[in-house]
Amino acid sequence: MAPQTETKAGAGFKAGVKDYRLTYYTPEYQVKETDILAAFRMTPQPGVPPEEAGAAVAAESSTGTWTTVWTDGLTSLDRYKGRCYDIEPVAGEENQFIAYVAYPLDLFEEGSVTNLFTSIVGNVFGFKALRALRLEDLRIPPAYVKTFQGPPHGIQVERDKLNKYGRSLLGCTIKPKLGLSAKNYGRAVYECLRGGLDFTKDDENVNSQAFMRWRDRFLFVAEALYKSQAETGEIKGHYLNATAGTCEEMLKRAECAKELGVPIIMHDYLTGGFTANTTLAHYCRDHGLLLHIHRAMHAVIDRQRNHGMHFRVLAKALRLSGGDHLHSGTVVGKLEGEREVTLGFVDLMRDDYIEKDRSRGIYFTQDWVSLPGTMPVASGGIHVWHMPALVEIFGDDACLQFGGGTLGHPWGNAPGAAANRVALEACVQARNEGRDLAREGGDVIRAACKWSPELAAACEVWKEIKFEFDTIDTL
């Protein structure tokens, strides 16, 4: 490091660059109940000691800068600084370490995920002393959780609104995702819902393009909802995507959905931004709308093992910002998801208290202090043969979304929906009777085919479909 030089301004200030670890590496520190705790996977540059790298992370994500400044003397840095209080090597990885950093609560604005992330996952990720940096987990203390509204309604209120109990919910993304006219889109929605699904969904790319303006889509979808409800006697929903180029336009679309009387709308929370998402979540609670959240762009942030941010952090942030549903991967479909890690962040989304469990990727005990839960949505390359595994893995409090697994049925959308509904109810009945779905799931589906020609046709179409690739994110 460069030598320190004393200025003429006064003997109390010495200009120059000093080692971060002299101030920000504090292994003797006892964490407080009010601290926000972070677990960073860091890969230091060659020659940089892990203690210096961990201290640099704590400094650059809190009060530090690259040099000593005289204004440090105008405040209590000891009160506001982040502290790297522990470092451990990553088993099986060369030159990778987990750095644990504690942040005092006063560093963050109440009720703002935007401010929280600006500090903790801000400029520090471009710091030259580090080859790579990944935020693996955050502990949000109850004192900070209580400053957030969280999901507009939560799992139990959603079930009460929809009058649906004792099973997973079923959904479907309308395909092709782009290019349909509003009228044909509404027809596809109607066919899926009358066939037995609970929800249909706008694709995340569907906003208000020239081939289908948002208001036209909203009107035809609302007509499909009411018609299918009248025919089936069940409450139906469609995730109308309110994501827009401005918050004002987003709220205008949400207002239209409310006036049409639909039960649920949708937002792309990463591309739309946390400020917009929190704004929409508050609107949804005030006006009785459920809020479905899509995670488009997440893999840009979370897919690399050594740099970025794990999805469990994005899931925690969404629960704070607000969303009743969140896409979470499937474990069994085409999109990535390792079982124990996926179930770890699924529990973080919907349970009230989660114990630390490193085998599931949970670095800290998390107490949500009765913040409403977010329902996980399993989607991506799933079909009727996956139903036993999905019911066994996710349980009842999940939404299972079959896009191609509904619309790809050889007889059409309604038979595809019926096949999924029959498969789900057969699996739920078998589970309730004490059967082991992990071992007997195939037999359960084959037995149900005998009294459901729609399911039999679906099973024949997808009997050979598998997505077998190694997962990237393993513990």
UniProtKB/Swiss-Prot annotation:
Residues 1-2 form a propeptide. The modification N6-carboxylysine is found at K201. PANTHER family: RIBULOSE BISPHOSPHATE CARBOXYLASE (PTHR42704), RIBULOSE BISPHOSPHATE CARBOXYLASE LARGE CHAIN (PTHR42704:SF17). The modification N-acetylproline is found at P3. Belongs to the RuBisCO large chain family. Type I subfamily. The record marks K334 as: Transition state stabilizer. Its EC number is 4.1.1.39. This is Ribulose bisphosphate carboxylase large chain. The gene is rbcL. It is found in: Plastid, Chloroplast. GO terms for cellular component: chloroplast. Coiled coil: none annotated. The keyword Kinase does not apply.
